[in-house]
């Protein structure tokens, strides 16, 4: 009779269990399908079903019914797959059931039972989004403890590597795994397990191929020069053997666009490589990372450099070099940020010779590949800023070491004359340094700074600098140097070196002889001496330009003008002078008027002379002949409005074809003083005197006979009817 009063959800669950006590039971197919339909169509029933499954599984565990426990675990997996949208309702009950099974010593040593638990774990992880459960601390702790218990049972109780790797693979499939801080340790443990099992199955990746001693720059591993034709290194994405769960687990952790998950995996990889430094393993993993995210590997490598031991620092630097010199493609690498970090660590560890030298090797390897245009130029500029402009002369030995290393692998022309002059005293291979100069001649300002820098160099470096300048920039160096040494006319190594190479460049034997005499006597060339060599256009094609430089007053010159057809320049050769725009008393610049406005102002000032007061009075007092027009009655205020408007209309009519009237909103007319404005106004009055018959005020006739007939506003006046339609009353 008790069965008649059993709730429906319990009936449906019980009907899924086949009878008997055999251990290999399977849930009934049709009953299970109906149960899934029942819980899907009635969401409130899910909680009741999960609660009843907890109660029934507890009873089955106590009675050691392994067959029923197997059926329960399969039902859990099916419910998760079919009701994953409402997983938050039953997930805690399901984890509680599996935890009870794993803690029961009668069942946790059964591979079949643990395998069924792994299937439930897989179903949960496939549909679990970390961003949705990150706020439920109770569930996060419950799930973390369950996963830890699963790995413990699979590894220690069963010693089943595949079950362990399957658990790692399942856990890695959680969406937004990296956003859950509580699970980061578990995720890192999964990566470590997968790496260890991978190395056990593939011994080639388990040997230490990098030692912690300093590797000379000439060692084969670090001196490898990449060619244009490269063979792609096999990576995680190239492996087709899906039966190896260690590779599948590593692939899900590293072949992902989720940077948080990738960062967790890379932290575990770095820790693993410090224990067994194998560059092949590093390249294998990195080649499976999406190419646009591989730069993260280098960033995470350099981050712990400052806090690591000397042994680990050397290992990290060598691993970075091995990756930079490998065939693994990397894009988007922030080269300057990496360089700054390396230099900072190098300065902090300047007392360790091995670390300093290894960092120099890594800096060199950083420039073996081109990640963006102007990369080499930026790296040289950064070295100059860190060591030269920072004013720390006790670090110049480090600068020389880094500079020599960087120059040895740089082949593109990326240096300007400024950096060339700065680097020359510190470089060992000065010939290679000169090959890095830009082929285009720089601006004369750069030349002036270059010649100023040359004056501080040794005699040998001065000779190299001047000769290199003439070899690369020829006429630009000749004329710029001439302009500089005319103003700085004093004996020096640079002075004589310039004139020596200038005479060779011009091919003037007498000039060369005089240079040697002047050098011997510590004498200088006068302008008259130099004009002799720039006087004949037949023997010196630069004679005209040279004379301009020699004859100009350099105290206020704007620079020399060099023909660009003769010498190719990237920027004009003349030394620019800063021209300050005209300003008002408050410092705001005045905008000049356009040519049209200038014409208007000029023409408006060329009218008739200014009328006197008597003429104006006669003009106002004149009366129109009443026989030609009808009269209207109006007040004096109306008359004044009509008069003003008529002035404007007549001016536009008569002068519109002759004078371009400027829009005051377009250009500001400057330069008109009070007197000019008065003349302009009076000229307008003059123009009105020649209006047609529509004008209210007639021309002046017999002005001497009339006086001032001013009338008050309340008096009546006569207004011409011809103004009808042109009155704008306000």
From Swiss-Prot:
It holds the Pfam family EFR3. One of its GO terms (cellular component) is plasma membrane. InterPro entries: EFR3, EFR3_HEAT-like_rpt. One of its GO terms (biological process) is protein localization to plasma membrane. Belongs to the EFR3 family. PANTHER family: PROTEIN EFR3. This is Protein EFR3. It comes from Kluyveromyces lactis (strain ATCC 8585 / CBS 2359 / DSM 70799 / NBRC 1267 / NRRL Y-1140 / WM37).
């Amino acid at each position: 009779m008790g069965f008649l009063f059993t709730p429906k959800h319990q009936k449906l669950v019980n009907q899924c269990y086949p009878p008997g006590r055999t251990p290999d039971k399977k849930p009934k197919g049709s009953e299970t399908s109906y149960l899934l339909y029942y819980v899907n169509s009635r969401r409130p029933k899910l909680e009741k079903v999960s609660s009843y499954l907890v109660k029934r599984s507890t009873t089955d565990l106590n009675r050691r019914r392994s067959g029923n426990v197997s059926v329960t675990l399969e039902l859990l997996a099916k419910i998760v797959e079919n009701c994953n949208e409402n997983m938050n309702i039953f997930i805690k009950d399901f984890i509680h059931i599996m935890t009870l099974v794993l803690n029961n010593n009668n069942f946790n040593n059964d591979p079949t039972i643990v395998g069924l638990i792994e299937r439930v774990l897989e179903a949960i992880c496939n549909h679990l989004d970390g961003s949705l459960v990150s706020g439920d601390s109770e569930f996060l702790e419950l799930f973390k403890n369950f996963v830890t218990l699963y790995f413990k049972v699979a590894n220690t109780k069963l010693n089943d590597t595949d079950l362990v790797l399957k658990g790692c693979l399942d856990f890695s499939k959680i969406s937004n795994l990296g956003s859950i801080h509580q699970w980061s340790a578990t995720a890192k443990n999964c990566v470590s397990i997968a790496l260890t099992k991978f190395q056990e199955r593939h011994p080639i990746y388990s040997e230490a191929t990098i030692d912690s001693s300093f590797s000379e720059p000439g060692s084969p591993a670090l001196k490898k020069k990449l060619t244009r034709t490269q063979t792609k290194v096999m990576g995680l994405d190239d492996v087709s053997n899906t039966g190896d769960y260690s590779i599948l687990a590593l692939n899900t952790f590293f072949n992902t666009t989720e940077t948080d998950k990738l960062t967790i995996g890379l932290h575990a990889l770095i820790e693993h490589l410090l224990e067994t430094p194998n560059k092949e393993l590093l390249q294998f993993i990195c080649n499976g990372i999406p190419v646009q995210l591989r730069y993260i590997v280098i960033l995470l490598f350099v981050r712990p450099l400052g806090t690591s031991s000397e042994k680990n620092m050397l290992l990290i630097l060598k691993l970075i070099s091995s990756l930079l010199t490998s065939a693994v493609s990397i894009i988007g690498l922030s080269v300057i940020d990496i360089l700054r970090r390396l230099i900072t660590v190098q300065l902090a560890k300047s007392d360790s010779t091995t670390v300093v030298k290894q960092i120099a090797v890594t800096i060199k390897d950083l420039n073996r590949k081109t990640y963006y245009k102007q990369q080499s130029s930026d790296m040289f500029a950064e070295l100059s800023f860190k060591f030269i402009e920072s004013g720390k002369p006790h670090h110049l030995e480090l600068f020389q070491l880094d500079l020599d290393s960087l120059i040895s692998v740089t082949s593109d022309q990326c240096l300007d004359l400024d950096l060339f002059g700065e680097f020359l005293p510190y470089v060992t291979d000065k010939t290679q340094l000169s090959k890095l100069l830009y082929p285009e001649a720089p601006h004369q300002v750069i030349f002036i700074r270059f010649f100023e820098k040359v004056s501080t160099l040794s005699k040998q470096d001065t000779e190299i600098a001047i000769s290199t300048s003439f070899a690369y920039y020829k006429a630009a160096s000749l004329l710029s140097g001439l302009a500089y040494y005319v103003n700085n006319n004093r004996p020096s190594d640079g002075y004589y070196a310039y004139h020596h190479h200038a005479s060779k460049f011009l091919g003037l034997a007498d000039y060369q002889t005089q240079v040697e005499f002047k050098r011997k006597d510590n004498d200088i060339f006068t302008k008259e001496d130099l004009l002799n060599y720039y006087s004949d256009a037949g023997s010196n094609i630069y004679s005209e330009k040279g004379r301009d430089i020699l004859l100009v007053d350099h105290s206020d010159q704007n620079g020399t003008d060099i023909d660009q057809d003769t010498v190719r320049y990237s920027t004009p050769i003349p030394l620019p002078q800063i021209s300050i725009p005209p300003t008002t008393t408050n410092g705001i610049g005045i905008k000049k008027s356009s040519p049209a406005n200038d014409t208007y102002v000029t023409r408006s000032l060329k009218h008739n002379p200014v009328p006197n007061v008597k003429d104006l009075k006669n003009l106002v007092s004149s009366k129109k002949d009443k026989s030609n027009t009808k009269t209207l009655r109006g007040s004096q205020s109306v008359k004044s409005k009509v008069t003003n408007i008529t002035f404007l209309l007549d001016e536009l009519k008569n002068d519109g074809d002759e004078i371009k009237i400027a829009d005051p909103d377009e250009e500001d007319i400057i330069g008109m003083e009070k007197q000019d404005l008065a003349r302009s106004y009076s000229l307008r009055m003059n123009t009105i005197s020649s209006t047609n018959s529509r004008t209210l005020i007639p021309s002046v006739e017999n002005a001497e006979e009339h006086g001032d007939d001013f009338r008050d506003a309340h008096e009546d006046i006569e207004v011409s009817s011809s103004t009808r339609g042109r009155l704008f009353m306000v």
